């Protein structure tokens, strides 16, 4: 197939520096060698914060989100003193599932008291339905994104310290939402849930914990969770720099683990999201995405099971396995040296090589498209495969 490439540069709009930017080690910081290409963005960030404030002030005041006909009540409390780099956010999904609303409401109330982080916002959403998949409906993802946006703007949350956890049906939700929204989370922990055949490759850059009682035999949860711990072991054996995980099949415990799983909270807190990992593995799940970390694909080609692998080494981006006709690569000065040419290769062939010109308009476009302070990019390369 003939290979062509397109380099997109947009210019207009003077802008300022992003808060909570992360270096390649996953910790908040900057790359002094490329600061010339990271001007102070507070004007753009301020515009974004204002837009979120306008859109979500009703949710902050009323403790309920609404998208279309769906409503998601949200409850939160704040623990500890706010760190200099912003609060953590723990999104904790309740049990229940295919039952009546009152039982799911009871499980939501129970979840509010289940875990106590030493620091951060502990937030429990009430699922939008009363179905077995109540936490990972196709409509759910947009609610989780809005929870994060609201928490960043109204509660001083650091978007690189957002954690996902859930028990029973909430654990079912974590199994699905952790990989398909992996670029949003700093770490995730699944408690007493069933994976329902989910693929795990997209967890490459997301620390992930699995908890299940050894006697939790309903739906073979104990056996399947042990199997999935083995799957993560195998993925990490093939890729030792990725797939940080820990699995616990708790001896003598059934579906209720008597609080043993609370150890997940300090474990997750050790990690901060790195929005710019050097290597990305992306497998589309039941809810398909157009963007993942610093990659973009044609929306019409985003189908369940489609794979994309890419990595950055110095100023070279290598595209590996790819089920798309084209790929968009979003870059900033924390990822590559923008003073030098950038190269994109695939199967040993150079698809693009050239010096990139940062675009203020692209920064704005990507920020308001992704609605994440870390995903405002000044440069983009699109290559056709």
Give residue spans per PLM region.
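The feature captures the conserved acid-bearing segment of alpha/beta-hydrolase catalytic domains
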Residues: 187-269
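Bacterial N-terminal signal peptides
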Residues: 8-17
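A domain-start/cap signature at the N-terminus of enzymes
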Residues: 22-88, 352, 357-378, 382-385
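Gly/Ser-rich "nucleophile elbow"/oxyanion-hole loop immediately N-terminal to the catalytic nucleophile
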Residues: 80-85, 132-168, 180, 184
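Acidic beta-to-alpha connecting loop that harbors the catalytic carboxylate
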Residues: 96, 127-128, 214-217, 252-253, ...
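Active-site machinery of serine-nucleophile hydrolases
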Residues: 86-152
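Alpha/beta-hydrolase-fold serine-hydrolase catalytic core, especially in secreted/extracellular enzymes
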Residues: 29-35, 73, 233-385
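Primarily recognizes the serine-hydrolase "nucleophile elbow" in alpha/beta-hydrolase
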Residues: 160-204
């Amino acid at each position: 197939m003939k290979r062509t490439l397109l380099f997109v540069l947009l210019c207009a709009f003077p802008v300022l520096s992003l808060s909570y930017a992360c270096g390649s080690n996953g910790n908040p910081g900057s790359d002094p060698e490329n600061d010339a290409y990271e001007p102070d963005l507070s004007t753009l960030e301020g515009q974004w914060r204002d837009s979120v404030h306008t859109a979500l002030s009703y949710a902050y005041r009323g403790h309920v989100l609404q998208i279309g006909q769906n409503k998601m009540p949200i409850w939160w409390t704040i623990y500890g003193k706010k760190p200099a780099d912003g609060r953590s956010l723990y999104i904790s999904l309740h049990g229940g599932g295919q039952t009546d609303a009152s039982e799911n409401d009871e499980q939501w109330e129970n979840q509010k008291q289940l875990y106590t982080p030493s620091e951060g916002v502990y937030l429990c959403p009430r699922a939008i339905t009363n179905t077995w998949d109540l936490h990972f409906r196709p409509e759910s993802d947009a609610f989780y994104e809005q929870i994060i946006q609201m928490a960043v703007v109204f509660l001083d949350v650091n978007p690189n310290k957002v954690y996902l956890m859930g028990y029973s049906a909430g654990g079912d939700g974590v199994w699905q939402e952790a990989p398909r929204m992996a670029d949003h989370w700093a770490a995730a922990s699944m408690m007493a849930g069933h994976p329902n055949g989910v693929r795990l490759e997209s967890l490459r850059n997301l620390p992930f914990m699995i908890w299940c009682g050894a006697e939790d035999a309903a739906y073979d949860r104990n056996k399947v969770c042990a199997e999935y711990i083995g799957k993560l072991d195998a993925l990490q054996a093939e890729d030792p720099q990725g797939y940080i995980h820990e699995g616990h099949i708790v001896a003598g415990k059934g579906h209720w683990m008597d609080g043993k799983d609370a150890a997940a909270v300090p474990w997750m807190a050790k990690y901060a999201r790195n929005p710019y990992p050097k290597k990305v593995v992306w497998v589309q799940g039941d809810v398909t995405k157009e963007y993942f970390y610093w990659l973009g694909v044609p929306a019409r080609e985003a189908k369940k099971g489609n794979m994309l692998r890419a990595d950055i080494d110095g100023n070279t981006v290598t595209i590996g396995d790819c089920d798309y006709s084209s790929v968009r690569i979003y870059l900033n000065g924390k990822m590559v040296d923008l003073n030098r040419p950038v190269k994109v290769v695939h199967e040993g062939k150079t698809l693009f090589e050239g010096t990139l010109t940062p675009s203020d308009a692209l920064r704005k476009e990507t920020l308001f498209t992704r609605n994440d302070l870390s995903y405002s990019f000044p440069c983009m390369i699109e290559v056709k495969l």
